[in-house]
Amino acid sequence: MIEIRDEAPQDFPAIRNLNVLAFGNPAEALLVDKLRAANKAAISRVAILDGRVVGHILFSPITVERAPARLHGLGLAPMSVLPEFQNRGIGSSLVRDGLEMGRQRGYDLVVVLGHLRFYPRFGFTRAKDHGLDNEYDALDNFMVIELKEGVLKAVTGLVKYAQEFQDLAI
């Protein structure tokens, strides 16, 4: 049975290795390390199976160009599952859990730059349809979900991820 919990310092090496294996390069692993070091890992959860870290999800703060000062938004990135455990529902469990953590912790919305066949099943819709743009010129695969009903009516403009994303050219 999968257990999902907040990351702990003893998980950091496994999370680093997991991201390298899942993405095939060290960029996302470096991003996680940099976000954590800058205290920008707002939500960072791990999936544990038989005592082993098999999945990880991280949410970091975002800003929206034209939004109320009180807006608390998150960017979902990265989310990874060890290759040998993919397509078993672990990623879906991490996303559902992470969104619920965001709601419980008072966040307003989450954006993701991700797979069109994966994220809509959780309620993500095309961000452009809500007047939101991104720094990466992504269109259809840049998506958003409200964690508080009606919040998207008050926001438009450019969504900016944490500076660490630009520093690593993710």
Model-assigned labels for residue ranges:
Residues 116, 120-170:
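Terminal substrate-recognition subdomain of acyl/acetyltransferases
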Residues 85, 89-97, 107:
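Conserved acetyl-CoA pyrophosphate-binding loop and the N-cap/start of the following alpha-helix
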Residues 85, 102, 119:
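Hydrophobic pocket-lining residues that define ligand/cofactor binding sites across diverse proteins
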Residues 1-31, 38-54, 75, 149-170:
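Short amphipathic alpha-helix that is part of the acyltransferase structural core
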Residues 61-63:
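A short acidic/small-residue loop/turn micro-motif
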Residues 99-114:
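Conserved GNAT acetyl-CoA-binding A-motif
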Residues 69-83:
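Conserved acetyl-CoA binding element of GNAT-fold acetyltransferases
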